[in-house]
Structures are given as structure tokens and as C-alpha cells.
Design a protein with these regions (language model features):
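ER/Golgi luminal nucleotide-sugar-dependent glycosyltransferases, focusing on the catalytic module
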Residues: 1-186
Length: 186
């Protein structure tokens, strides 16, 4: 089972040594080399990093990476065996390649735990943390291109919980479908 989990980063930082983890320098176009694979080679959208953040690395993986399973984590956020707070404790709890193989033999997609927001909806959380224009435009594009998803979009926006942080590992065919859909909206 060939698993590659991108570790999105914009700076040098501690990285897991397990070969399933692949540090990727997101927004690498025009930046100094920090020693990681850059998202600026092959078919890429690295120059859009200011607006797309880690999605430039995800796009790069979609177009250039050969793997049976592809995932995304962040240089300070990983899937761990148990919840831990300190960086040092987290390093010892990050899932290994062997643990990923076992998990992915049972589930085609793994996402981050559900996070609950008791005092606000996903829409209000997004609007408070980001520019509301982006969500409004995405909603409009979904209504135009994928009207069958409009009700689900509204439902998710009105919820007070979500699987946050853009972290997942997916079987390649599902990853391809996800990227095809998402990047057609962005």
C-alpha cells in the first residue's frame, strides 16, 4: 500500500521521519528553498498560495504524485493516537505508516475528529475567521454548477460542528474525485 501524506509547511520545522509523511513547501514559487519538495514543479498553482494556502500543495499532489492513498496534514497538526497538547508529546503519538495501513485497510477515507462550536454556526465561524466573500462566492458557484449540493452546503453552513483543519487521508480514486470537484469551484 503506497501512502503519501503531505505535511504542508511554509518554513523549516520538525518533520516525522516515517516515509509516509512528505513535507511539501506550499507557496514555493519565488521563495527560498527550505529543503522540502516544493509545490512549484510540474502541473501546479503555487503562485495562488496567498489565497489557496495548503490547497496549492494538495493540487500539486493531485497532478504530480503517484500513490494509492493521499493525505494532508500540517506542520503543527497531525493525526495522533490520542489527543495531546505539547509538541514533544505529539511527536510520540503521530500515526505511523504501519498504523495507517491497518486503518486504511478498513476505511477508504479518514478525516479529523468532529469539532463542536456551541455558540456559532460553521458559517459564522468562517465569517469571523476569514473573509465572508469567499464563502459567499463558493455558495454561488455551487448553486450554479452543482445545484444538487446546495441543500447540503446550507446544512453544513448552519451546523455547529465540522471536521476542521483540512486534514484527511483518502484512497486515490476518492481523492481524485474530491479534487476534481473542489478545484472546479475554486
Amino acid at each position: 500500500m503506497n501512502i503519501k501524506i503531505l505535511v504542508a509547511t511554509h518554513k523549516q520545522y520538525w518533520m516525522p521521519e516515517d516515509p509516509v509523511y512528505m513535507p511539501i513547501h506550499v507557496g514555493r514559487e519565488g521563495k527560498v528553498d527550505i529543503g522540502y519538495t516544493g509545490d512549484h514543479t510540474g502541473d501546479n498553482i503555487s503562485s495562488k498560495n496567498a489565497n489557496y494556502c495548503e490547497l496549492t500543495g494538495l493540487y500539486w499532489a493531485w497532478k504530480n504524485l503517484d500513490a494509492d492513498y493521499i493525505g494532508l496534514v500540517h506542520y503543527r497538526r497531525y493525526f495522533t493516537r490520542k489527543e495531546v497538547r505539547s509538541v514533544e508529546d505529539k511527536k510520540n503519538q503521530i500515526l505511523t505508516g504501519a498504523e495507517w495501513e491497518k486503518l486504511l485497510s478498513q476505511y477508504p477515507v479518514v478525516v479529523a475528529d468532529k469539532r463542536k462550536y456551541y455558540i456559532e454556526s460553521n458559517r459564522s465561524h468562517y465569517n469571523n475567521a476569514h473573509h465572508s466573500d469567499g464563502l459567499d462566492v463558493a455558495e454561488q458557484i455551487i448553486a450554479e454548477r452543482y445545484p444538487e449540493y446546495s441543500a447540503a452546503f446550507t446544512k453544513v453552513c448552519n451546523r455547529t460542528w465540522a471536521h476542521m483543519f483540512n486534514m484527511f487521508v483518502m484512497r486515490r480514486d476518492l481523492f481524485d474525485q474530491y479534487c476534481e470537484w473542489m478545484f472546479s469551484i475554486l
